[in-house]
């Protein structure tokens, strides 16, 4: 039996789309999609509908009270681990990969139970609680920013963000007008916002709509374009990805 890979991603497109991009890339490299497994939640699976892979939907506990929340709801976490372990049993999973969020600690534990190599992708300058905890067990943490904080530097491997390499300008030109979304609302906002400023200076004549989440307490860009709209924060991120 061939060794297989399992991705853990939950929530909105920010955590799930990178996994989708990786799955597409693996398929292009010749990996059988039936040897790829994804653990996600109800929100996450909607971004994976067109992929012919093995998907398991779980309702992992979300802590709004840091580590204390996880401690108080430990039975729920154990139940999720049991369900996922049962799904992956006898599948010969060799690699576990997570894009973070509240599923990351569960991914770390599953990797230990399966004796699989564990990897993390960190999308922010400051790692979230899930990735901070899980990084202890990770073989490597792939970062989107060169100066990622609060994770052991020995484990960091700067790769940049995970993007869709199959998307070309010819694909975009098939549609009359596209909307580009820039997410500057998390850690790393300043770097992303500076990039948007430079992007608009060089690409302002393109037939694009721009939606830019700047993040709270960040300076607004003075961009004079009818196609550009900025907001501090978006409550429902699913709406942003639609």
Feature roles, as predicted:
Residues 66-95, 113:
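An amphipathic, basic-hydrophobic alpha-helix
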Residues 43-46, 95-114:
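An aromatic- and histidine-rich active-site surface loop
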Residues 37-39, 43-45, 51, 172-242:
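Donor-nucleotide binding loops and adjacent catalytic segments primarily
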Residues 2-10, 27-76:
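Conserved nucleotide-sugar phosphate-binding/catalytic loop shared by glycosyltransferases and other
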């Amino acid at each position: 039996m061939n060794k297989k890979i399992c991705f853990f991603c939950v929530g909105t497109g920010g955590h799930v789309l990178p996994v989708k991009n990786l799955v597409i890339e693996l398929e292009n490299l010749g990996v059988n999609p039936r040897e790829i497994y994804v653990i996600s939640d109800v929100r996450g699976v909607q971004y994976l509908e067109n992929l012919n892979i093995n998907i398991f939907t779980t309702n992992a506990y979300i802590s709004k009270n840091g580590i204390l929340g996880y401690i108080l709801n430990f039975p729920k976490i154990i139940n999720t681990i049991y369900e996922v372990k049962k799904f992956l049993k006898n599948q010969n999973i060799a690699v576990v990969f997570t894009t973070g969020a509240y599923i990351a600690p569960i991914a770390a534990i599953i990797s230990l139970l399966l004796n699989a190599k564990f990897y993390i992708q960190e999308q922010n300058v400051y790692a979230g609680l899930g990735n901070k905890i899980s990084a202890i067990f990770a073989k490597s943490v792939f970062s989107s920013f060169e100066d990622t904080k609060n994770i052991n530097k020995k484990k960091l491997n700067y790769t940049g963000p995970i993007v869709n390499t199959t998307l070309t300008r010819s694909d975009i030109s098939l549609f009359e007008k596209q909307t580009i979304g820039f997410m500057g609302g998390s850690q790393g906002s300043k770097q992303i916002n500076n990039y948007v400023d430079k992007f608009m200076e060089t690409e302002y004549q393109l037939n694009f709509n721009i939606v830019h989440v700047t993040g709270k307490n960040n300076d607004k860009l003075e961009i004079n374009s009818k196609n550009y709209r900025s907001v501090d924060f978006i409550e429902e991120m699913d709406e942003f990805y639609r």
